Swiss-Prot record:
One of its GO terms (cellular component) is membrane. Keywords: Host membrane, Membrane, Signal, Transmembrane, Transmembrane helix. It is found in: Host membrane. It is a single-pass membrane protein. Belongs to the IIV-6 010R family. Residues 1-26 form the signal peptide. The chain crosses the membrane at residues 33-53. This is Uncharacterized protein 043R.
Amino acid sequence: MVVKENFCGACLTIPLAFAGAGTAIGAEKAATIKKWSIVITIISLLLTVWFIYVKKCSTCKLRP
């Protein structure tokens, strides 16, 4: 028997943004840390908006 769990992309984007920023900080020099952190944050915000408002996430009920 296979149990399929509902997947919510919006719920996953913020933790992935923090993980990506942490990876960028650990891998890059101090001069580029801020740039990559901002880029990753903007991408994660765009993904969050996409999953919540465009895809109309019904799993987590985050949409107002």
